[in-house]
């Protein structure tokens, strides 16, 4: 298998310094220290809502949830002060917020999370504490399963240098680092739990995989992007090569147990009143088809056809559901028919891209979900996939530019994007002439739009024109990536089908 880094990229040169037997044990400590150093460099910059009253931003939302869970009875977590960053994530997020709030309140400074009076509180010490919680979460929850995934696929990339060069590029993907450690969120927790589920699928530990994925769902509802592919994969393992009804029952019990465990306080107190409120807060359909400008089908279509003026909210929900089901159906069917480990990442990627492009209530930051399974394809050691994986990462961080620019993270954006592409020699193109033209066109488009956005003010009549150009190009790119993941999934599954048919005939 050819390496993605056959031309000696800087990341490969870095890893090669640890290839000797006496130095290999130093590689992972140095890698972790480098990752933490990069996270802190990004964290020095501003965050979402910095010094922008009255509502501030995501930083204040996360801080407020620590305050809320610390001073409010559990039964009121999803009822209190809904106008001031009311809790709108599932209970595991609330538990984590409570845990960090306890640490900050009792071990550092109670003023940070004082009831009501701490709203909008900003200080260097609080920023340091909050940033530290994200970095710790990233290292403890996301990094270990990514390392395991890379190691599991190492049999296809036996070379120490090439294998770990791929791991570095996955760990340093710009979009996630900029959103979690710049803008400020805890996406690394949800993505880490999803990766733990995938890691356990690789080990055939289906109950553990189900448990971790349920935890991901109870941390952030956006993990639903992965629910159909993991369901059909697990269902496939229950019926192929023979029907295992006991496994299906065991997995079903695991789902019920995990959700019951997480929701137990609300079930115990008053499930008839409290559970509907949690669902209402977690799935706010009344907010509309999308928020802000997001590079999905509906927001892009709205620039030329005002769909929200033609269809009712309920009609849009039904239409988006139909489009989403159509987009994810092929990958789900393939994972059911061929529950093979080599199809996992591609199946997850294809289905989650379909969700991002066509589902209801999409945020621009949701691109991090399909980007994860797309990025870990680097660990599979196939040189032909690198141009598409690199394009997906560059398009993803490009689509986040309006948000990061608003946050004042321009320096971090350009530094990290340029560094990531340079150390991994990521701006490469497919040998296929058509694919090469498509990839080159998207890179040129991104450079042109960024240049216009930086140096030319938009027309006063169309203040969002540059953002709309960004959204349109990003959607076209994401749809292309979706088609690529689906096409590759179909190609590999057809080869599996042929191999199985030949074995039966033999």
From Swiss-Prot:
Which reaction is the catalytic activity of this chain? an alpha-D-Man-(1->2)-alpha-D-Man-(1->2)-alpha-D-Man-(1->3)-[alpha-D-Man-(1->2)-alpha-D-Man-(1->3)-[alpha-D-Man-(1->2)-alpha-D-Man-(1->6)]-alpha-D-Man-(1->6)]-beta-D-Man-(1->4)-beta-D-GlcNAc-(1->4)-alpha-D-GlcNAc-diphospho-di-trans,poly-cis-dolichol + a di-trans,poly-cis-dolichyl beta-D-glucosyl phosphate = an alpha-D-Glc-(1->3)-alpha-D-Man-(1->2)-alpha-D-Man-(1->2)-alpha-D-Man-(1->3)-[alpha-D-Man-(1->2)-alpha-D-Man-(1->3)-[alpha-D-Man-(1->2)-alpha-D-Man-(1->6)]-alpha-D-Man-(1->6)]-beta-D-Man-(1->4)-beta-D-GlcNAc-(1->4)-alpha-D-GlcNAc-diphospho-di-trans,poly-cis-dolichol + a di-trans,poly-cis-dolichyl phosphate + H(+)
**GO terms (BP aspect):** dolichol-linked oligosaccharide biosynthetic process; protein N-linked glycosylation via asparagine
State the function annotated in the UniProt record: Probable dolichyl pyrophosphate Man9GlcNAc2 alpha-1,3-glucosyltransferase that operates in the biosynthetic pathway of dolichol-linked oligosaccharides, the glycan precursors employed in protein asparagine (N)-glycosylation. The assembly of dolichol-linked oligosaccharides begins on the cytosolic side of the endoplasmic reticulum membrane and finishes in its lumen. The sequential addition of sugars to dolichol pyrophosphate produces dolichol-linked oligosaccharides containing fourteen sugars, including two GlcNAcs, nine mannoses and three glucoses.
Q: Which GO terms describe its molecular function?
A: dolichyl pyrophosphate Man9GlcNAc2 alpha-1,3-glucosyltransferase activity
Cytoplasmic topology ranges? 1-24, 154-163, 232-247, 339-342, 404-408, 458-464
Q: Name one GO cellular component term.
A: endoplasmic reticulum membrane
Gene giving rise to this polypeptide:
alg6
Give residue spans on the Lumenal membrane side.
Answer: 46-132, 185-210, 269-317, 364-382, 430-436, 486-506
* Protein's membrane topology: Multi-pass membrane protein
User: Could you tell me where this protein is found in the cell?
Assistant: Endoplasmic reticulum membrane
- Entry-linked InterPro entries: Glyco_trans_ALG6/ALG8
Q: Name one Pfam family in it.
A: Alg6_Alg8
Top-level taxon? Eukaryota
Pathway, according to UniProt? Answer: Protein modification; protein glycosylation
Q: Indicate the transmembrane segments per the record.
A: 25-45, 133-153, 164-184, 211-231, 248-268, 318-338, 343-363, 383-403, 409-429, 437-457, 465-485
* Protein's recorded name: Probable dolichyl pyrophosphate Man9GlcNAc2 alpha-1,3-glucosyltransferase
What are the record keywords, sorted? Endoplasmic reticulum, Glycosyltransferase, Membrane, Transferase, Transmembrane, Transmembrane helix
**What family does the database annotate?**
Belongs to the ALG6/ALG8 glucosyltransferase family.
- EC no. given is 2.4.1.267
